[in-house]
Swiss-Prot record:
Pfam families: Flagellin_C, Flagellin_N, FliC-like_3rd. It comes from the Bacteria. Individual Salmonella serotypes usually alternate between the production of 2 antigenic forms of flagella, termed phase 1 and phase 2, each specified by separate structural genes. Flagellin is the subunit protein which polymerizes to form the filaments of bacterial flagella. One of its GO terms (molecular function) is structural molecule activity. The gene is fliC. SUPFAM superfamilies: Phase 1 flagellin. Gene3D superfamilies: 6.10.280.190, f41 fragment of flagellin, C-terminal domain, f41 fragment of flagellin, middle domain, f41 fragment of flagellin, N-terminal domain, Flagellar export chaperone, C-terminal domain. This is Flagellin. Keywords: Bacterial flagellum, Secreted. It is found in: Secreted; Bacterial flagellum. GO terms for cellular component: bacterial-type flagellum; extracellular region. Belongs to the bacterial flagellin family. It comes from Salmonella dublin.
Amino acid sequence: MAQVINTNSLSLLTQNNLNKSQSSLSSAIERLSSGLRINSAKDDAAGQAIANRFTSNIKGLTQASRNANDGISIAQTTEGALNEINNNLQRVRELSVQATNGTNSDSDLKSIQDEIQQRLEEIDRVSNQTQFNGVKVLSQDNQMKIQVGANDGETITIDLQKIDVKSLGLDGFNVNGPKEATVGDLKSSFKNVTGYDTYAAGADKYRVDINSGAVVTDAVAPDKVYVNAANGQLTTDDAENNTAVDLFKTTKSTAGTAEAKAIAGAIKGGKEGDTFDYKGVTFTIDTKTGDDGNGKVSTTINGEKVTLTVADIAIGAADVNAATLQSSKNVYTSVVNGQFTFDDKTKNESAKLSDLEANNAVKGESKITVNGAEYTANATGDKITLAGKTMFIDKTASGVSTLINEDAAAAKKSTANPLASIDSALSKVDAVRSSLGAIQNRFDSAITNLGNTVTNLNSARSRIEDADYATEVSNMSKAQILQQAGTSVLAQANQVPQNVLSLLR
């Protein structure tokens, strides 16, 4: 080896080794201080990528576990609401069993139906208001997906179903609906009659509703004017009394001619503005048409102006063809051909009333015709029908009986087999509750599996990126010794050029 001064090879070699030991010492100290074997990609590029993927999975699965717990909470909230709906249904069933007992009076059935209605309304309220984090869980059919994995498509679906009165098949549930109307019901409705069978008189008023085509009850009101379809009496409704005035009789097709002729004669013999008395009622000639007795006369009853129109009447042997009462209020008018006219300020309709005897019995087959539709009641006591459809007796909130047709009764009709309907509703609720219970158990299983997976992934990631302290402490001790030795040797190496100077002495 040459003896040189400019280049100290031993010193350079020692410095290089000293730098290596310094780097090892720094790495060991960094790992020991961070607890990680991989602090940057340079420590282990592949290991860093693998550990990073594990981290993504671990974080995703941890959140998925929380999602599954939220799913359990949703199912529990929904199931709790269904439990309350079930309680209401059980009470409705209990009341329905009570209602089917024949010992109940009408008031008992009404009280039972009132509570049933309240219970059904509570079911709808629970359905509309139950929600989880702003999501209504029973108001509509919905599939709620719960993410229970770290990747796309890893979901569990909760089937939320609409549970309300309508979806349970209990819409219109009624244990106190209208009953089929019979002739007995029809006869009993014609009461408070004096002398004649009156189609519209007294406290219970029946009329034909042209709009719906159903016979309905009309409560006593001060703004109705009626004409007796059997005897021609004019009847005005008053809360305190009924005023009747005989105008003319219409029990036969030719009856009433004398009375009508008397009015026509008064018109013919007078002039417009003249007054005359007929059967204790003062009439005024409003309009006179020609000299044949045609025209209009009017009178006032209970403050209501009523006009009688006489047309096509011959003073001779001809029969009366038509006579119509008109008023600003609702008017029911009897005419000699057995028809009566409805004046409802918008249109006039006709209906035929026949074969109702004065003693309130039904003679043969009684028919009421409205716009071609015949209401038929057989004298044998059979039910009343309209065009083959059964009529029903219903009671309003005030207790007034109403005769309604089959279509109108459909919404009010007592529920057929009410207990079976309730059992069906309970079965549907039970099915939904069972589904929610099963989904809760499934979520529990998913949470357990997610926990196991997260634990295993954490262990795998730890083996890749966590520092082994035994190894790192050993590496640090080794590096420290090398540092000390290197520093000492470097001092010796730096003294080697001094030996060359001895050659110059």
